[in-house]
Amino acid sequence: MVEQVCAKLKRECYRVNITRQTDEDDLLGGFRLINGQTVWQDGPVVTAMKQGGVLLLDEIDLGSANLMCLQPVLEGKGVFLKKIGQWVTPAAGFTVFATANTKGKGSDDGRFVGTGVMNEAMLDRFPVTLEQPYPTKATEKKILVKAGCDDADFATHLTAWSEIIRKSFYEGAVDEIVSTRRLVDIVNAWQIFGDKSKAIAMCLARFDDDTKEAFLSLY
């Protein structure tokens, strides 16, 4: 959503995909060997600060304690690049967003393997938390049409089907869910193979047999 809003507003967006290995060098910058010379290169965080851009820390709950180097940045202050002795002050418009499937609390059920409980001090530096629900059926249908689904009935059926599955998931009746991304995958598979049932079955194949059969029967 952040990238789409930035595109709409014509704002520069710097996306960083966070992993357990992401460290200060990846984020703030470091020395790189270029044409035989050791040259300092700003990282995406510093670049976004200087340009007054939007910084998107994607899947931040996959990171480690190395992310604590971002504390002053999240406070809205500048950051000191100790390797080159330079202080960087954020330009006007600089904004930080982060996405996290677990809201920084980790995953006890194993659905988001690799995530961990984030440092509470870092979480406290994000003043606003927004939960992004799935789109309405009308909006989701538009997404599928834009993805290339030229069969209105198929798009309507897919969105109604996914809504039933999501309701069942939230009520605890099923353990899996069909996301908007997976619906788009179904549309793409249908465009390739020309068979709706095959496309749905292929995109549900990642689930266990019982879940797959239950979802297919719902359709």
Regions found by a protein language model. Give the residues of each.
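C-terminal regulatory/interaction module of P-loop NTP-utilizing enzymes
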Residues: 1-219
